[in-house]
Amino acid sequence: MSVKIQLLSDLHLEVHPHFVPGPAPGADLLVLAGDVGSYQAGTLLKDDDFGLGRFSPKNGWPTPVLYVPGNHEYDSLDFDATHARLRQTCERLGITWLERETITLQQLMGAKRFAGRPQPHEAHEAHAARGPSDAPDAPAVRFVGTTLWTDFDALGPTSVLSATSSASSTSANAWAQQQTARDKAFRAANYYLKKALTTRHGELMLAAQMRDQALLCQTWLRDALNEPFDGTTVAITHFAPSLKSADPRYGMTPGTAGFCNALDDLLPLAQLWLHGHLHAPSDYTASGCRVVANPLGYARKNEQTGFKGGFVVELPVKYGIFPHPD
């Protein structure tokens, strides 16, 4: 059996305000992997909900919706105030906020049926084992989400440096190479970040501040993925987890480290990883994890040819017994 996940990202409704993809036939839920809409200079969005209202279950969207914020939602705004505003917007619209949050499919859907759910005779053993206070059989799936951001270290000597490396175990030369690569990535990113005009604590939020946020998200994500779970794990991030997602139009340049992380060691901890940010689709398997992106991108840059509005990822799942949520 499978759970069917519709995936959309990088819709950039600030320049495509009339773009409204429809629900994918048979989808069990929708994942919005960031950069849905922003209020950067010249935005064409007329509402105050970052374009999320059109995906609201309260406004008629037929499935649960999971949302991980991107980077552009913060353009021309204060980071912390916007973070709170986005979360409140999701709560108002009935969209599940997934920034440094984990939710199971059982929590997300409750007792609702979904397209991939087996009939009772197909889960006889599970039904027989269920006690009177248990909820109906449900797929054992958890969604672990964060914007993730980037540490700008993807193009450094990552085969030597890792999250567990220490100064005593790593050569001074390797650390110097890492810093040089990071500085180049900072310069490439800051060219654009200065135009984005995101502020934090009264100052522009540039690459160094973004790295600080990325390290917080990485620590959270690593801990969350390492939490024992008897089921299928889906990671959802805006920034890519691996250089394997790099946009082939640009190759491996310092700017690539502003889009991709080198967190390949985390891939075995998930069965599916959904992301956005790069305006190039991805669908590959690494270390047993399928990595998928389905971004719309910018029409003016001819980036939309690979986008599929009704794209659905079918996730094979096993079924478990869950107690009724409190």
Where is each model-derived feature located?
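Active-site neighborhood of phospho(di)ester-bond hydrolases with catalytic His/Asp-centered motifs
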Residues: L7-S9, L30-D35, L66-N71, T96-E101, ...
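Active-site environment of divalent metal-dependent phosphoester hydrolases
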Residues: H12-H18, G37-G42, H72-H83, I103-Q107, ...
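A basic- and aromatic-enriched beta-loop-alpha substructure that forms the phosphate/nucleotide-
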Residues: V65-G110, A138-V160, S168
